[in-house]
Amino acid sequence: MKVRASLKSLKDKDGSQVVRRRGKLYVVNKRNPRWKGRQG
């Protein structure tokens, strides 16, 4: 999982979902887990 300042490029990937957990923004991608990320 990458920690990024901006999730814009990750959320545009095919199969990505933006999720908010414990006040942090995450991108999860079950099709291609390589594109997982957290903002901050």
Swiss-Prot record:
Disulfide bonds: none
InterPro entries cross-referenced by the UniProt entry: Ribosomal_bL36 (IPR000473), Ribosomal_bL36_sp (IPR035977), Ribosomal_L36_bact (IPR047621)
Keywords: Ribonucleoprotein, Ribosomal protein
Cellular-component GO terms for this entry: ribonucleoprotein complex; ribosome
Any GO BP: translation
GO terms for MF: structural constituent of ribosome
Keyword flag Ribosomal protein: yes
Family stated for the protein in its record: Belongs to the bacterial ribosomal protein bL36 family.
UniProt cross-references to HAMAP family, sorted A to Z: Ribosomal_bL36 (MF_00251)
Protein name, per record: Large ribosomal subunit protein bL36A
Organism per entry: Saccharopolyspora erythraea (strain ATCC 11635 / DSM 40517 / JCM 4748 / NBRC 13426 / NCIMB 8594 / NRRL 2338)
